[in-house]
Amino acid sequence: MALAARLLPLPLLSWSLPGRATRLRTLRTTEVKLTLNEFCCLCRRRLGSSAAPIPRCTWAWASPTMRSWGPRRPLLGRAEHSPALASLPASPIRSYSTEEQPQQRQRTRMIILGFSNPINWVRTRIYAFLIWAYFDKEFSIAEFSEGAKQAFAYVSKLLSQCKFDLLEELVAKEVLQVLKEKVASLSDNHKNALAADIDDIVYTSTGDISIYYDEKGRKFVNILMCFWYLTSANIPSESLSGANVFQVKLGDQSVETKQLLSASYEFQREFTQGVKPDWTIARIEHSKLLE
């Protein structure tokens, strides 16, 4: 019994009932016979010579009347392990250093919660369904919004660089002529503010959808898209009344000031039979820049 007390953890000892013996396994392959006859507190089976050996994960608490805790040890004293535990492989230890610095994030994303007019939201979904049902079976308002977002980033960059020749097939001719005059009168900082990087577009919304026929019977669909984007162009806040200003800090770098601007692009497509299925931009507006 003294040998078992040294090899087995204390919770494996059980209430003693005379007359039977059972085998208790230690953490090694050595088996010890003890004169114990009891009921397991977990499965309520009688532990006898015919019972299966107690698995290593089975725990039975000792009876309060039979506990023998021995001499008390300090709660924070050094733990002493049995010789059976010495043969077990040591678990890997991961060391930490107070000098290690966490990896710095290179980008900071801004999340803006936008709430559109519920009436307008329902209206645009109804018109989107009509476009799908009567004009284009492959039309999806979600896919169109994603494509419009990419087109906005591309066209706005060309506008800021005054590359109007590359916009001739993307923007309506009468609209492009007006844009040339407006962009030419802008300062360099205002031109830079026209460009919207696709990663700086923080919110996109469907403004309006219209379906109409002209006097020649041609079918047209217009979709107005609204975009909100951040720009780091150096623009005096007085010239952009109503614009929101944000300060963005990336890691340990200096604080960068960005302004939140908005733009509206109206996309148009003719669904007349035999016409090339291309979307063109029929209107471009940049709040406080191109109006």
Curated annotation (Swiss-Prot):
Keywords: Mitochondrion, Transit peptide. GO terms for cellular component: mitochondrial inner membrane; mitochondrial matrix. The keyword Transit peptide applies. Its main location: mitochondrion. Residues 1-96 form a transit peptide. GO terms for molecular function: ribosome binding. GO terms for biological process: calcium import into the mitochondrion; mitochondrial calcium ion homeostasis; protein insertion into mitochondrial inner membrane from matrix; protein insertion into mitochondrial membrane. It is found in: Mitochondrion matrix. The keyword Manganese does not apply. Interacts with AFG3L2. Interacts with SPG7. Interacts with SMDT1/EMRE (via the N-terminal transit peptide); interaction is direct and takes place before maturation of SMDT1/EMRE. Promotes sorting of SMDT1/EMRE in mitochondria by ensuring its maturation. Interacts with the transit peptide region of SMDT1/EMRE precursor protein in the mitochondrial matrix, leading to protect it against protein degradation by YME1L1, thereby ensuring SMDT1/EMRE maturation by the mitochondrial processing peptidase (PMPCA and PMPCB). This is m-AAA protease-interacting protein 1, mitochondrial.
